Amino acid sequence: KGSYKEILNGFKLTKKIYGNNNANCLCVVDINHNPLEVYQHFKEIEANDVHLLFPDNTHDTNTINKGQLFDWLKVIFDLWYEDKDVQKPKIRPFIDFIGLLLGELNYGNEMYGKRQNKTLVIETNGNIETVDTLKICGNGFTNTNLNIFENELDDIYVENELARKYYNSHFELCKKCTMCPLEEICGGGFLGHRYSKAKGFDNTSIYCNDLAKLICYIQNKVYDNLPKDLQDKIEKLHYEDIKEFIES
């Protein structure tokens, strides 16, 4: 049984109690759903902020072909970017990538950019762990021997290698990422999406091509709408050049 009705009721209740500024949604991208219908739905429920999340997979579990995620996101980006409705939702990662491309480094988060990841999880038994999305890497992958009743939160960064890796995940990148022209924007993507049993986190993201294509596409759209004097100060990105580097 789906939980859509319960979620929608909870969303409406949140709006009623806390106001429209807190009417925010997380949405894992499903490329089998019509992106036009998805965008229209978020407008219909008057969502204030929508965060489109990439499906959580690793190099060992991913089934999405290169380009499929971009093709889906491109449709929504075009709808959103051309939408003149001032009440349209703010959609991540679009606003984040635009901010990063314009030099606003504060737009980074655990998915992209060049900020440190400071989120921890306290399990129901009090255990201190890194974010639960890293459990996609394997059973018990985020387990620690640390507990809030016996430890300080910062202890995890001393005693747990995974926590340190996650904290610095946009700085500890594979060689390919460190040489990429988009490294400052992409930041290597989400840590879990780089994982493989064979090489650990020493990989590019499973969504590397899609991220590169999306970043270039967004930059080109924004570039084309800038005044000529600003265009002269900015180098337009070309996906084919990035692709050649990625696949070399």
Model-assigned labels for residue ranges:
Residues N125-N127, I136-N139, I148, F171-S248:
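Radical SAM enzyme core and accessory elements
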Residues D30-N32, N57-H59, D96-G99, N127, ...:
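Short, solvent-exposed loop/turn segments at secondary-structure junctions
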Residues L69-L101, T133-T178:
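C-terminal accessory region of radical SAM enzymes
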Residues Y112-Q116:
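Short, small/polar residue-rich loop motifs at catalytic or cofactor-binding pockets
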Residues L36-G108:
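Long, K/E/R/D-enriched contiguous segments that form extended
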Residues K1-P55:
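Radical SAM/AdoMet-radical enzyme domain recognition
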